[in-house]
Amino acid sequence: MLHNFLHGSGTITPQSSRHSPEPAGDPDTNNPHTMPANPRRKRIVIAMTGATDALLGIKTLLALRHLNIETHLIMSKWAEATIKYETDYHPSNVKALADYSYNINDMAAPVSSGSFKTNGMVVVPCSMKTLAGIHSGFCDDLISRTADVMLKERRRLVLVARETPLSEIHLRNMLEVTRAGAVVFPPVPALYVRPGSVEDLVDQSVGRVLDLFDLDIGGFERWEGWKR
């Protein structure tokens, strides 16, 4: 399902400008400042860093789009490089999957404030540099600042940590962000699904991430006990 949806997207939008969200459609109808406060669609922030597994972030955006969840995307420059290296997609195509896209240096973006209500954030994939910044509260870009907002506002923050092996520093950072309220989610392959492809494994990880937001995308196998 997600595989077919991914390859059906070909929209290209310009890169986000500073202090301005980048809507995927008409800016007059998609500006978050003009939308009614209630009722509103669920909002989730997606941040992509330069860690490997860019496809996880792309598939997460696709799944949320399929569920009609309003998405706010922040992409680092190294995420853009990883997308180009690991996939057949251009960063502009990935940005087009989100409702809004922000420059990582835009510290005045709506998502940088706790008064802008969201239902949580996923950093996918999450580099160890980003993890360290979130742990220390060192908000030097929009990704770390928005993650800091999630923690202080007691909103769901999921960090899809992508590194192996892990040093003591990595483990300490993971422990501290967990104590602060985040969920550390290593995308461990679920071999019990008997995957037929890498994308089967990616889809299973994406589904499990969205389970943490009480969102069911379907289309992936769940454990139901030993099958005879």
PLM features per residue range, with description:
Residues 2-158, 164-228:
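A cross-family phosphate/adenosyl-ligand binding-site feature
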